A protein has these predicted regions:
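N-terminal, positively charged nucleic-acid-binding surface of large information/translation enzymes
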Residues: 1-159
């Protein structure tokens, strides 16, 4: 008989459960009667999630799971927000710490630096949502700078 470990390995158990849920594709749109679709108010990519995000995601997760258990077709859509001015500020501070400014590197390189920041922190946020055990459909994430979203914003606010 295998001896029980003296300490509980939280990270290993969490990873094993997460892998099982993701491999089982449990969080894709479920079949059912009636539609329940929720879009996460997208956290911006200027940092990491905090307790307010955890509380908000817990409430949404409870709602989605409740509807899934009642047999409704459910989908919880993951998204992140570019947070343009806030991201610019973060990248400006990062560049300043390196002894350079956005004016010195020029517009194109600065935009590249903003995209690098977005990719780094956007990916981290998605991993945090996974680690919280949120029943989000990870197969189709959205970003506010995606073409479809940007076109929709221009249509609503500019046309």
């Amino acid at each position: 008989m295998e001896e029980m470990p003296k300490t509980y390995d939280t990270a290993a158990v969490e990873q094993r459960m997460l892998d099982k849920w993701l491999e089982g594709d449990y969080y894709r749109r479920s079949a059912g009667v009636g539609d329940c679709t929720v879009t996460i108010p997208p956290p911006n990519v200027t940092g990491k999630l905090h307790m307010g995000h955890a509380m908000d995601d817990t409430i949404q997760d409870t709602f989605v799971r409740f509807n899934r258990m009642r047999g409704r077709s459910t989908r919880w859509i993951l998204g992140t927000d570019h947070a343009g001015i806030a991201t610019q500020t973060k990248v400006d501070k990062k560049l300043a710490a390196e002894g350079i400014s956005r004016r010195e590197i020029g517009r194109d390189k600065f935009i590249d630096a903003c995209w690098d920041w977005t990719n780094e922190y956007g990916g981290f946020i998605v991993e945090q949502v996974k680690r919280m055990g949120c029943s989000v459909d990870f197969s189709d994430p959205h970003f506010t700078m995606d073409d479809d979203y940007a076109k929709g914003v221009r249509k609503v606010f500019c046309d």
